[in-house]
Amino acid sequence: MGYNKSLRYSRHNGTTCVIDNKHLKTLGSVLGDVRHKEELIREAQFDPIKDIANQYMVTEDPFRGPGKNVKITLFKEIRRIQPDTMKLVCNWSGKEFLRETWTRFISEEFPITTDQEIMDLWFELQLRPMQPNRCYKFTMQYALAANPDYVAHDVIRQHDPYYVGPDNRERINLSKRGLAFPLTCLQSIYNENFEEFFDQVLWPYFHRPLVYVGTTSAEIEEVMIEVALLFKIKEFAPDVPLFTGPAY
């Protein structure tokens, strides 16, 4: 007697049947049992490693932590990048940076008030190719702990760079370990004297990044560079409830 589908049990009841006093099982159920046993073996091998790993703590991505993100766009600029070279993105002490930043692209008012504490600071870089249908990747190099008196070169040669993310966006954490940012009147300093805002307010407590950007193209490319500072702030709860009306 051959295999007859009518003699087989329903899929909802099981995957085995008895034909001519022989216990038969589908090949799919056999493969499923093998896979299940392999998963049990892998779990048994992983359990001792997991017990040891649970004794240690690791830090999560601080960008995804608690707090509110406040983004300030410093400038947007189109620059031409030569092949096999990298261009300095931002010269923090240059007059061109101050003029371009504060006269054209900067926000009129600083969005962080005095009752908010800065928890973290990020340097955000967004790159966009200006010509369509260009097949190349963006490369990047940066330094954080540079000497304040160091004069950065505008153009350097590419040497072991790394690729910018798939969305052509990169964030660099500028926090210094062991230094807490004090509560200061940031809004008034920013609006009254923006030229000293970086040197006197930010850089004593955060790293001043030197960021270089390049491409993998063999031709001269025009790139739109958008530079922004992203503040992660912690808002304090008000001292009195914000209720209005005759009952209060």
From Swiss-Prot:
Keywords on record: Viral occlusion body
Family: Belongs to the polyhedrin family.
Lineage: Viruses, Viruses incertae sedis, Naldaviricetes, Lefavirales, Baculoviridae
Organism (species): Trichoplusia ni granulosis virus (TnGV)
GO cellular component entries: viral occlusion body
TM region(s), chain numbering: none
Molecular-function GO terms, alphabetical: structural molecule activity
Disulfide-bonded cysteines: none
Name of the molecule in the record: Granulin
Signal peptide start and end residues: none
Function: Component of the virus occlusion bodies, which are large proteinaceous structures, that protect the virus from the outside environment for extended periods until they are ingested by insect larvae.
